[in-house]
Amino acid sequence: MSIILGIDPGSRVTGYGVIRQTGRHLEYLGSGAIRTQVEDLPTRLKRIYAGVTEIITQFQPDMFAIEQVFMAKNADSALKLGQARGTAIVAAVNHDLPVFEYAARLVKQTVVGIGSADKVQVQEMVTRILKLSDKPQADAADALAIAITHAHSIQHSLHIANSVKMTETQEKMTALLKTRYSRGRFRLKI
């Protein structure tokens, strides 16, 4: 069982979503947004840090997943987004959480099935996947989608690890059978 905190960073609105993963089952724990309406960037970053810290304290996540920075046309916006993202990551690291990063395109591909999905499609699929009665707001839905992507990544990694173990076991059994067969201990009947 793992509790995953997903973050959709922004210098004015930072979405968050928290889910619990038990095997393949995902359970919604909470979501929302940290809103920073002040004009001063350092004060906004301080509020993001305090907000993420409060969420970590409240939900006690085991893992922290965040969207990677994309290349924006406006350099100033990209820099502010990077600073907001870095602030959230520092809050996670200060609470000894492992940090995982996912590209927006991968998140959309995982949750919707299309890497170019729009926000409405992401909201709809998050609502379905987590069996929510109401659609979460856009920034919270994006954060939940990031958490869902991380949960799927964990499941995929476990599946691969189990496949590798099975393959290694099969190879060992095959080698053992070949050894016994070559020594005359086994006879194959056809």
Curated annotation (Swiss-Prot):
Its EC number is 3.1.21.10. Mg(2+) 1 binds at residues 8, 139. One of its GO terms (biological process) is DNA repair. Keywords: Cytoplasm, DNA damage, DNA recombination, DNA repair, DNA-binding, Endonuclease, Hydrolase, Magnesium, Metal-binding, Nuclease. PROSITE patterns: RUVC. It is found in: Cytoplasm. Binds 2 Mg(2+) ion per subunit. It catalyses: Endonucleolytic cleavage at a junction such as a reciprocal single-stranded crossover between two homologous DNA duplexes (Holliday junction). The RuvA-RuvB-RuvC complex processes Holliday junction (HJ) DNA during genetic recombination and DNA repair. Endonuclease that resolves HJ intermediates. Cleaves cruciform DNA by making single-stranded nicks across the HJ at symmetrical positions within the homologous arms, yielding a 5'-phosphate and a 3'-hydroxyl group; requires a central core of homology in the junction. The consensus cleavage sequence is 5'-(A/T)TT(C/G)-3'. Cleavage occurs on the 3'-side of the TT dinucleotide at the point of strand exchange. Homodimer which binds Holliday junction (HJ) DNA. The HJ becomes 2-fold symmetrical on binding to RuvC with unstacked arms; it has a different conformation from HJ DNA in complex with RuvA. In the full resolvosome a probable DNA-RuvA(4)-RuvB(12)-RuvC(2) complex forms which resolves the HJ. This is Crossover junction endodeoxyribonuclease RuvC. It comes from Haemophilus influenzae (strain PittGG). The lineage of its organism: Bacteria, Pseudomonadati, Pseudomonadota, Gammaproteobacteria, Pasteurellales. The gene is ruvC.
